[in-house]
Amino acid sequence: GWAGRGGAAGGPPAAVPGQGNAQGAPQAPAVPPGEWRPWRFRMSNDVWGTPVVSSGRLYVTSFEVHALDVATGRRQFKTRDVAWTMAVSGGRIHGSDGPSLYALDAADGSEHWRTGVDGWIYSLRADAGTVVTGTRGGGVQVWDAAAGRLRWERGGAQTEFETPESGPSVVDGVVYFHGGGRLHALDATSGAEHWSYPTGEGGAMPTRPVVADGAVYVTVGNRVLALDARSGAERWRFDAPAVMFAPPAYVPGPGVTGGGVYVADYLGTVYALDPADGRDRWRVATEQRQSVEPVLVAGGSVMLGAGGALYTLDAVSGTPKWRFAAQGEIVGSPVVADGRVHFGSKDHCLYTVDASGGQLRWKLETGGEITGSPVVSEGVVYASSKDRCVYALNAVKGTEAATRRA
């Protein structure tokens, strides 16, 4: 059974010093040398999605993209245009306001290039010099990230689920997209098709594929497929009793050490599949979940938010370890760092619990639901809330100050 933990007795909400404000509020007092203090930055508009940390900056989407200094929380710049979608890669911010695509310097916000698009961009991914966009009506465009030049475009992508989670993606120089009941794999440079595979699930929500160790893993409807990355040939398939909204999570290695393919269906049942043949090693029921986030596998444990609780299972055996109950639905994906698990909830709180036993270490009560997933970098956890704020907290002690890392 589950070792139950709860967040109701987590103590009073923590106070966070205000470090910045979109309306020009006074700056916080100077921080003593060698000390880092938690900070909060309040936007003038709603904050959405998951923040991105890169090269000493925190990038947050709040209509525009805002670049904040991770040490102080002071805003370095913001974009002049709306960014409905954003990707940070190769020292650049790639964003779209819908009908246009642009690239900015991630250090100072200066514009590198901008181009119009024939359609409305709903999905944007960037990787290794390539930008891939999906447009309403089944369009797929592939761009050179350096110059903004259109390399190639295709039609015929699926239109039933035009969401960022189901849009086209790029991995290791290959562009993947769903269309016509098939998963297509095309060369990111030339657009030549490497292969396509019939997924056979018309009308079912497809997910972005996971590519690892020469295989492509993808969920479509209630099916998990493992395909050869070079040829597209099917290695195995697994049919679950219920539909899956989230992509699989892959862990290298044999099952006896926790390796495998891990998926969860919308009823909250977690499956551990053998990566060699797709055999169902174990399955464990939790609570119904609507999340499009994959389960998290870290430190020999499988973690997932389901309903209003965070569940942790042993990756090898599926044995329940612990369950932490929040006061609202878990949002996004948890993140594990230095023996702690950080996650947000619709109950307005950001939680930090012990990874081994699920004991509450600290929580922060904000003025709204947590949005996206928290991010941890160099001992700091960052999270956004529907109270229009982004928070930077000491990952160990929450709102307490910390010694700066050299």
Task: Indicate where each model-derived feature is located.
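A short helix->beta-strand "capping" segment at the edge of beta-propeller domains
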Residues: G24-S44
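Positively charged, low-complexity intrinsically disordered regions
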Residues: G6, G20, Q76, V142, ...
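Short loop/turn segments that connect beta-strands within beta-propeller blades
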Residues: D69-T72, D105-D108, D144-G148, D187-S190, ...
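Generic cytosolic/nucleocytoplasmic N-terminal low-complexity/intrinsically disordered segments
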Residues: G20, P320, F324, L393-T399
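A structural motif specific to WD40 beta-propellers
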Residues: R37-P38, R74-F77, S110-W113, R149-W152, ...
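Repeat-blade elements of multi-bladed beta-propeller folds
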Residues: S44-V65, T79-Y102, A106, T115-Q141, ...
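Sequence/structural signature of beta-propeller modules
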Residues: G1-V31, T403-A406
